[in-house]
Amino acid sequence: LKNLNVWGDGGIITTDSDEHAKRLKLIRNHGLIGRNECVEFAYNSRLDSVQAVVVKHMLGKIDNITKSRISNALYLDDKLNGISEIDIPKRNNDVKEVFHLYMFRANKRDELQQYLISKNIDAKVHYPIPMHLQEAAKKYGYTEGDFPVCEMAGKSVISFPVHEFVTKNDLDKIVDHVRSFYGE
């Protein structure tokens, strides 16, 4: 649901389990049964009325939003293909990707990001420190090298927006500057 933007935080959980549904309803509302009986400490995870109105409106646009994101991502796939210093993920025709972000692995990722930012391109690095190397995970005893693929991704993945407001001109600018950075 990251592609369905509301004006703040929101989310959705679906289940076909009555047991799970009952528990989820309980924990979304402070663990309250009725108004005055708290059977479990929990958070307020309900959408407020304004958020609910925004979500209801946006749900009617989700198909177009998704089509736009897919189109933008596949356009970048096509235009960036062949640049030797980047690795675009292989797409599986049996999987419908909706592209919250467009991501690929890049050699000299940090330098590329700084170059693109200097050209006013919204290039981001998400999750540069893998979860197993975060302070919160120290108690589990993981060390660098335990998850090499994850660590490599943390050091090389860069992302770009492909939301419905990105234009072909914006995408071409990304492509031109990535090619320019790598001298291709």
Locate the predicted segments by residue:
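Active-site PLP attachment segment
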Residues: L1-R23
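PLP-dependent aminotransferase class I/II
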Residues: D16-E184
